[in-house]
Amino acid sequence: MRIILITGISGSGKSVGLKALEDAGYFCVDNLPPTLLRALVTERLEEHGTTLAVSMDVRSASSLIGLPADLAWLRSQGHDVKVLFLTAKTDSLIARFSETRRSHPLSHRGFASDSTAERRTLTECIHEEREMLAGIEEIGHVIDTSGMRANKLRAWIKGLVESDHSPLTILFESFAFKFGVPLDADLVFDVRTLPNPHYDEALRPLTGRDAPVQDFLQTQPDATALLADIRGFVEKWLPAFKNDNRGYLTVAIGCTGGQHRSVYIVEQLAQYFRPTEHVLVRHRELD
């Protein structure tokens, strides 16, 4: 059976992710207590089910301690088990809670009346939740949903599901350093040393996906050399990542604004590796 467990920080999009899996044909259960996972799998097998997706959150934190053992047991029974851990930067989470007017699951007492106290209390809840789920984050594939719209997250989850038959999925992601390094990055490369198309008025409104920007960077020796170095590094160490039984490898490429140079490098890397590997692309500041 193909089993996907979605967990992570409150407000990071677990419900959206679970709905995407439901749309992909998975039998889904929301907020399943970890202690019931084995029984649910057994029940699905009796019903001849082939897929299962469950979400778990911090409200089951006390039971999550035994989850690694449960996952190991399921894998020993021949099941294909994947864990997706959704997270986001604290500012993004605060904004989402403000938009939805929902309370954090760990807010056991009411917020103070002034907005500063409310923000501080919510921040403390998020920090506490991160600490409680740290052990689970280590065993899952981390997806940073900061700034990611719901439709993009649905597409992202769909891409991951479609990669289930591939031993390793490479996620190439562009980003802007001024907005922070992606939380889900395994490898991070800085391409801010390359000539910046931003200073060319004709190229400024374009992105690294546009031909004029690509033509500009392809004529820059440093861009060609840096691209070759990054490509060579990933190519050299890819077998080691595969041998480590990883399901996903996230390669993050950063520049100043996340619009030109990092986007160009990501597109070139994806084009190079796509014929032989399962590749996904995300341009964080453009999507």
Swiss-Prot record:
| Keyword list, A-Z | ATP-binding, GTP-binding, Nucleotide-binding
GO function term, MF aspect, one: ATP binding
Q: What are the binding positions for ATP in this chain?
A: G8, I9, S10, G11, S12, G13, K14, S15
Pfam families per UniProt: PapZ_C (PF22740), RapZ-like_N (PF03668)
> Could you say which residues bind GTP here?
D57, V58, R59, S60
> What does the sequence similarity comment in the record state about its family?
Belongs to the RapZ-like family.
Q: Please give the name of this protein.
A: Nucleotide-binding protein HEAR2885
